[in-house]
Amino acid sequence: MINKLNIVSGFKEGRSYLKDAFFTRPFRIADIKEDKTDPSLYLMLMSSSPGILDNDHYDINIQIESESRLMLESQSYQRLFNMQNGAVQQMNVSLADKSTFSYVQHPIVPHEQSIFKAYNVFNLTDNCSLTVGEIITCGRKHSGEVFLFSKFQNLTEVFHNGKLVVKDNVLLQPLLADVQTLGQMEGFTHQATLMYINTGIEDVESCIELAYAELQSEENIAFGVSKPFANGMIVRVLGNGGEQLYNAFRKIQRKLWIAEEKLNIKSQVTDLAENYI
């Protein structure tokens, strides 16, 4: 069954708003903005399903129009149930000039014999920002299910003006290869990735320092930060608790969001001054 979700985040009179939305079961979306004076758009992606089932096909399309800012949140942990054929999720996100998209989802819990593949494509133009985070757990650890899923794959591609700048492929097949070996999970049970790309700045060094400072205070994790190119940052974390990693990523996400908001305000003031002159 193909389950569809389409979102268009618009911008009008200095405020981001939900310009258009279409979804089929089990998807739902909710506006979760707390501060009505905040010009950004905050949406929660909700589902009436207990999780992703065998033969499910999720098709998610998100369009961020020029100058619009959207922070998308998930409702809860994403469960991948026992499968024979597998399930697929495709997400396509397009960011126009001076737009922002930020999405750190709750941890994914793959059940025994689950088979899942996600394919994410992000198309960026100039002066836009992307923050996306994902956390993969070992399964239902407290029920004795530790790396008993069949296959988990998450392939992400990021394009800037049509040019591929990042390709990230996470593939876990614990029944075929030992995931606890050196270079894999190394004794940890959770793996997390946070990706930040800003095509409007020349260097993300300050963002890397921000991520390091936040993660250094966390206990019982291993992490590293890489810079694939000047205005891109990828954070990798290994840990043993989904909630810990999720909260750490959310802290980094909020700080990046606030920093960008200040830059946007400064840019708008500069544009107004130039137009006045």
From Swiss-Prot:
Subcellular location: Cytoplasm
Cross-referenced InterPro entries: UreD (IPR002669)
Name listed for the protein in its UniProt record: Urease accessory protein UreD
Protein keywords: Chaperone, Cytoplasm, Nickel insertion
Molecular functions (GO terms): nickel cation binding
GO cellular component: cytoplasm
Subunit composition and interactions: UreD, UreF and UreG form a complex that acts as a GTP-hydrolysis-dependent molecular chaperone, activating the urease apoprotein by helping to assemble the nickel containing metallocenter of UreC. The UreE protein probably delivers the nickel.
Organism classification: Bacteria, Pseudomonadati, Bacteroidota, Flavobacteriia, Flavobacteriales
Family: Belongs to the UreD family.
Described purpose of this protein according to its UniProt entry: Required for maturation of urease via the functional incorporation of the urease nickel metallocenter.
Phosphoprotein found in the keyword field: no
